[in-house]
A protein has these predicted regions:
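Structural motif
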Residues: 18-24
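Residue-level "contact hotspot" at macromolecular interaction interfaces
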Residues: 10-17, 30, 42
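Short, small-residue-biased leader/transition segments that mark boundaries at the very start
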Residues: 2-7
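Cleft-lining beta-strand/loop regions that shape enzyme active-site pockets
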Residues: 24, 29-192
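Serine-centered coil/turn micro-motif
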Residues: 8-11, 138
């Protein structure tokens, strides 16, 4: 049974497959109950695969062409979904007042992502949750500590019109860091 679907671009999604549908065949090969169907997808990432599907809700059988993804791509999609769910939860529970940023790794790419989220999407928030859970480590602790420890030293308000603060490139508001037991190395030490 199809339990979940990952659609990367909903504007391009044109499928009858939905949770609850049963995939009966892959490229014409029957899938027996309890049988491992993974070998039928081996080496087919990014290639067209024909699925024969049964929808028990409508009693309809149909076929659809799909392109399977790699395990790495699946992991990335699951991660992005998890982050978006946490962001939406924080936004809902705080009535839009608190931002959420996840630091995936303690490396340059993660720092750029964190910086962009924090000083972009979260800039107007009253506070931010910086989530370091499930982080594999790296060398970012000092950069993150500096980014989160900004202190306001100037406000620019010419003729009564507020246009910004200094420092502009550091977080000036309250922050809360989340961590967990599987943070590794630098990610484990950062919150201390």
């Amino acid at each position: 049974r199809q339990r979940q679907m990952f659609i990367r671009d909903r504007t391009k999604a044109d499928t009858k497959i939905k949770p609850g549908c049963i995939i009966e065949k892959i490229d014409g090969t029957n899938i027996k109950s309890g049988e491992d169907y993974y070998p039928l997808l081996s080496g087919k990432a990014g290639k067209q695969v024909l699925l024969s599907v049964y929808d028990p809700a409508t009693k309809e059988r149909f076929e659809e062409q799909v392109k399977p993804i790699t395990y790495g791509t699946q992991s990335d999609l699951l991660y992005k979904r998890w982050v978006e769910q946490k962001r939406q939860m924080v936004d809902k529970l705080s009535n839009g007042k608190i931002g959420y940023v996840h630091v995936k790794g303690m490396n340059s790419e993660s720092f750029r992502d964190t910086y962009s989220e924090l000083l972009g999407r979260c800039r107007e928030k009253e506070a931010v949750i910086v989530d370091t859970r499930h982080n594999g480590g790296g060398w970012l602790h000092e950069d993150l500590a500096i980014l989160l420890s900004g202190e306001l030293y100037a406000k620019f308000t010419p003729r009564g019109q507020f246009i910004g603060n200094d420092p502009f490139n550091r977080w000036l508001k309250p922050s809360c860091v989340l961590m967990c037991e599987d943070n590794y190395s630098n990610a484990h030490g950062f919150p201390w």
